[in-house]
């Protein structure tokens, strides 16, 4: 950007083009980034064909493989953590919390905070079709698409399935074959059958498309 020097703005960074600014400690060039990797990464795989988002800031982990612990709501997952039912190495799956399933794609902060409180933040992973915020700590994957409410693979995962997250390979996979389970899946009853949230659930697009309504 550029501001005209006669517009009342003194000679500062704001009055010059970015190419003329030599002290680049804040806005770095591609050749000299602040860190070698960004704060988030997009993964794809058999568990997230349309993609998902993993937060990398705040930890150095890039790989995790473990048995799935499946929960159909944030509340059920939170209770399991509080009751001591989650073990080191587990991959916690929280589903039906996406844009359509929630509805609204609420934040899974309570579960991640509980995991940190139980001392499990560095030894488990969490995968959800819900979302996270900047306050989240640990190896967390959100925005899984397609979401469970739309019949995405995350809806077919069962307790004990082996789930593998590999940030370097940009993959999120489940080892088991989901095909035979497809015919057994039935969409759950909607949480709202009337009102604004019911309408929203019917209209909202996938998280991979911005969760917009048409």
Write out the residue ranges for each language-model feature.
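Acidic, glycine-rich flexible loop/linker segments
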Residues: 92, 131-214
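Short helix/loop capping segments that flank catalytic or ligand/cofactor-binding pockets
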Residues: 50-53, 79, 101-104, 135-136, ...
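Glycine-rich phosphate/diphosphate-binding loops and the adjacent beta-loop-alpha structural elements
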Residues: 91-104
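Structural motif
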Residues: 19, 39-42, 53, 62, ...
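Active-site loops and adjacent core secondary-structure elements that bind or stabilize anionic groups
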Residues: 21-63
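Generic long, charged, amphipathic alpha-helical segments
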Residues: 79-81, 88, 103-111, 115-143, ...
């Amino acid at each position: 950007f550029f501001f005209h020097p006669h517009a009342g703005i003194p000679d500062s960074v704001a009055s010059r083009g970015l190419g003329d600014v030599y002290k680049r400690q804040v806005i770095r060039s591609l050749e000299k980034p602040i860190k070698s990797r960004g704060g988030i990464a997009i993964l794809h795989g058999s568990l997230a064909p349309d993609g998902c988002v993993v937060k990398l800031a705040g930890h150095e982990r890039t790989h995790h493989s473990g048995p799935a612990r499946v929960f159909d709501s944030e509340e059920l997952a939170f209770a399991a953590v509080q009751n001591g039912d989650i073990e080191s190495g587990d991959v916690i799956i929280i589903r039906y919390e996406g844009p359509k399933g929630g509805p609204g794609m609420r934040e899974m902060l309570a579960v991640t905070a509980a995991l940190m409180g139980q001392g499990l933040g560095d030894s488990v992973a969490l995968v959800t079709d819900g979302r996270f915020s900047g306050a989240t700590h640990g190896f967390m994957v959100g925005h899984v698409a397609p979401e469970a409410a739309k019949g995405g693979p995350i809806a077919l995962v069962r307790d004990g399935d082996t789930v593998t997250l590999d940030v370097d390979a940009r993959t999120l996979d489940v080892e088991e074959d989901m095909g035979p389970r497809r015919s057994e899946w039935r969409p759950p009853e909607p949480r709202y059958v009337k009102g604004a949230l019911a309408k929203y659930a019917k209209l909202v697009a996938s998280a991979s498309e911005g969760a917009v309504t048409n």
